[in-house]
């Protein structure tokens, strides 16, 4: 074994660093030292682990003297844990054992000492040992603390841990998560403790502690990322369920993908449980149907479509697992035969994929050549996946971009260079995809209608303007086609200059006639054509998106409809093409998330992203916002949502995002400094976000900023409880700074929101986060009238109950202060004149909907003035922060006549609706001055009555 010259400096650097830190390594046997240099050149994980783990360096040569270690895992780990007196020590020992054995496995893999089967078996047996022995150790401790869980007959009940996916199949990869399900035979209560608890409660607590023992990141690392989402009802389901509850769920609610997942299910340490056979017999009918079940093909086809969508969404390329012909397609091929015929053919009920392929060959369900292609590809790709992950102990299936890593991977797999590896990967994946396409691939469905010949010619003959002119004027019956001709010919010319591969060109040849047919079927084709082609130009080199539109006619129809109606939407889709997936299902597209569900939907959306991956969490927030706004705008265009409801949706979306941003920021800041100690004596975080202006008034538009103010109730003497303790108020300052950072950072998906915090006490020169008492004092002693006007439109959009109450009290009391009428009127009018002079319309013949006389800002100032003037007489006027309900309240309390309140409300909502429409068209907020004449006159009359 030798390294190429390009990798020798890195290997030597790691070697010298190790010798310096652990001099005894120089005494290792020469054969082991030779292997050491080789492995150090290939694996940063091995180098870093040995560097910090001297006990491992002491024993590694003796470990490597054994050709196999899986038979020792359980017994050795049980001895290690027997010496542990508490969970902190157990966590440390488990991680040390895991690191020791993973170095051993990586070493064997890089030195090509094992077959793939030996490597996967060691990885799976190691995981099973860590899971099962941790459970055994914890179960004894929990029984001492809470009593032993028993059934009605007094028989002790164990918790069975079902390993899913590759863990269950004995095919775990190097840096895999582990998917688990917890179950127990019977309900009952604990016995032997001072207070009995239900078995369900016992096993839930046990499960929580087991997850923490394995999953929590410590200075020694972690054992495994534990994923419990495959359990019944997912994240919302109980952590542990009885056999009876499990059986009810799978019989009544089990879905196709759960059948797919359950094929590989295996109980950890199953030989220890007499109850195992009962569980196995219970689950078998759900997984394997007695009849031949061809519906499995369609189910797997849908799952493959979902995976393809995720590949597009995440921008994955060179992915040997999820890409076309990757590991997942080999697994799907095996699964389809298991699901279709496993009920009748016991030989197809194997958990391991290679065993299943053997059975498929024996039953002649595929040709011997096809099975051999699948077997060879699977072995190669799985070994490549393990080596890729063992380089840095990272969970990835994407081939590296860096040249050094490309060379490392090529050498590790036994090839001379990167091009050789690329060829080998490509050949294997092409063979797999051919079998997959034959067996599971999309059925060739006839199009609902044939695309007319002239739409093919619009694409094929685009280089001949005279042909295009004839088609548009004669075949399509459109006059004045000059602009469309230029658009079509320029689009084809531009694409000719782009680097688009053969596959992309082939898709464009199929897609473009369909695009032209859909565009020219629309009455506003002159708008839609340029917008749709501009979008296609932006995604022309991203073949997966072109294929999406080609394969989903409904998505293409929606694309044309939305782009024709709104340049804002077409630009958004062009900038962020992952949104194209949302067009596939029109029923979903035109039904925005229910108002009360935005927070839940956002949490679910972010749950698929590792909590510690802050960059992807930020990206996820932006993607969720874009998807949600697309659905809101689509419903708006379709007339499903009136303008008030559009603003409601945009506001509830913003509130959900604020809550998620605060949670992310809190996690980041508290992990560094701990939490302020005063929180131990109260619920919540002691922090609030107050929304002003449009977000405060439930009146957000598509392009609105967020005007926000931060508050806390932290006492002066409080510090945080982390190792790096800081002053409590300093903690909240850093929290607010982190929140602004998350909102404002420009990622691949842009910024989240523009945020403005200048409405805080003392403006830009004031504290970024105001203590509640200081906020109250400022409002009473120092605030200007315009700041009290702003308070009319303020409400808390995030915060716990004590802060909610404190802010509500301050706002109510300030707004109810008696004010001298003349002075109030003068200050409001002066501020309005100043704003109009600064922001009002300068265009002749145009009316600025917001700032000109008789516009929206005049209406808002009227509402604020009347609340400030009359709330000391009518305190209930302070209840609402939105203008529509303020006018309703003014009418109900006889401050304003019904006719005037309704007229102002109508003027306000009509102008806002026009601004929404113009936002969708990317137009400025001004109209011809012949519009809204009656409404403006009514606003001016009201202004003269109250403020003239």
From Swiss-Prot:
Q: Where is this region: Adenylyl transferase?
A: 452-948
Q: Which CDD domains match?
A: NT_GlnE_GlnD_like (cd05401)
EC no.? 2.7.7.89, 2.7.7.42
Q: Where is this region: Adenylyl removase?
A: 1-444
Q: Which reaction does it catalyse?
A: [glutamine synthetase]-O(4)-(5'-adenylyl)-L-tyrosine + phosphate = [glutamine synthetase]-L-tyrosine + ADP; [glutamine synthetase]-L-tyrosine + ATP = [glutamine synthetase]-O(4)-(5'-adenylyl)-L-tyrosine + diphosphate
UniProt keyword annotation of ATP-binding present? yes
Specify whether Cell wall biogenesis/degradation is a keyword of the entry.
no
Q: Which GO terms describe its molecular function?
A: [glutamate-ammonia-ligase] adenylyltransferase activity; [glutamine synthetase]-adenylyl-L-tyrosine phosphorylase activity; ATP binding; magnesium ion binding
Recite the UniProt keywords alphabetically. ATP-binding, Magnesium, Multifunctional enzyme, Nucleotide-binding, Nucleotidyltransferase, Transferase
**GO annotation (BP), single:** regulation of glutamine family amino acid metabolic process
Annotated Pfam families: GlnD_UR_UTase (PF08335), GlnE (PF03710)
What NCBIfam families does the entry give?
PRK11072.1
Recorded family membership = Belongs to the GlnE family.
**HAMAP family per the record?**
GlnE
Q: What does this protein do?
A: Involved in the regulation of glutamine synthetase GlnA, a key enzyme in the process to assimilate ammonia. When cellular nitrogen levels are high, the C-terminal adenylyl transferase (AT) inactivates GlnA by covalent transfer of an adenylyl group from ATP to specific tyrosine residue of GlnA, thus reducing its activity. Conversely, when nitrogen levels are low, the N-terminal adenylyl removase (AR) activates GlnA by removing the adenylyl group by phosphorolysis, increasing its activity.
| Protein name as catalogued | Bifunctional glutamine synthetase adenylyltransferase/adenylyl-removing enzyme
Species source reads: Vibrio cholerae serotype O1 (strain ATCC 39315 / El Tor Inaba N16961)
